Amino acid sequence: MKKLLEYLIKAIVDHPDKVKIDEKNLGEESSIKIRVHPDDMGKVIGKGGKIIKAIRRMAYILAIKKKKRLILELNES
């Protein structure tokens, strides 16, 4: 899941070298923290939050297939 999210987010942003994704698996729960350059926050969030909602939806579907609960956070680095 980490590789897919990294690929998608790096394709959107202007500073792909500043994208960092940390994934922690805690039994039935996965926590993913995405960090991007402050200038790229708007691009990742998208108009009305459409981009980040689509990314979250896709990540949640993958988590459901693995029978895990997912926590996804987006922060500036």
Predicted segments with their positions:
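Residue-level recognition of oxygen-bearing side chains
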Residues: 50
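RNA-contacting regions in translation and RNA-metabolism proteins
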Residues: 1-43, 53-77
